[in-house]
Amino acid sequence: MYDTPTSWDKSLHVPADIQKIVDTVKSLEDDGVRAVVTACGFFSVVQEILADAVNIPVFTSPLMMVPQIVRLIGSDRSVCIITASERLLVSDYLVPVGIESNMPVRIVGMDSSAEYYATHMGGTRTTWDVDLQRKELIEIVKNAVLRFPDIGALLLECSQLPTFSADIQDAVKLPIFDYIGFIDMIYLAVVQRRYSGIL
């Protein structure tokens, strides 16, 4: 895992310390790691850079799942991406992982979540009220579903949000795709299970 970078090149939308990240991924490969996952969906901008640097799979962002989800839910439904900031998740982060402008995608930010912004996205508070966060996030998702009745699935872009996936699903009864499901898929790709018994 490589956490959210502290400094971004605003003009290129890539981490200012990209070479450090590349070196880290190479070091992990040298240590025998079979796949690398980053810990911020906004790392989609460096997917190609990191994948080209090593000979193991690199998965930078659950945003990579969006083109597949679009095909799963039918052409009359949309995928709703729940992200830290609707304003910040611009096409620079979408195009590198195959999200095209004509895809039925709704982007909904957590900008109204006071609890999230107190502890993430530059917030300095070190304690996280998980129950309050759950309540705020469910409210954001419920409002999104009311605003966009065509939503057929949700993608939680942030690595902190799978904590609440089951609660969100209970509230809106929709398929939820998140970082943990993404990682489970990756794990099974590089550590295949064995089958036995009557086949």
Please place each PLM-identified region on the residue numbering.
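Metallocofactor- and cofactor-centric catalytic cores in central/energy metabolism, strongly enriched
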Residues: 1-39, 49-51, 144, 150, ...
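N-terminal glycine-rich anion-binding loop in soluble enzyme alpha/beta folds
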Residues: 1-19, 85-88, 92-128
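Gly/Ser/Thr-rich loops at beta-strand to alpha-helix junctions
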Residues: 35-47, 58-65, 84-88, 157-163, ...
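Glycine- and other small-residue-rich loops at beta-strand/loop junctions that grip anionic moieties
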Residues: 39, 129, 133, 153-157
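Short, acidic/small-residue loops that bind anionic groups at enzyme active sites
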Residues: 49-73, 169-187
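Conserved beta-strand elements of the Class I
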Residues: 78-82
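A short, acidic, amphipathic alpha-helical segment used as a generic capping/interface helix at domain edges
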Residues: 133-150, 163
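C-terminal functional extensions of proteins
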Residues: 157, 161-163, 177-199
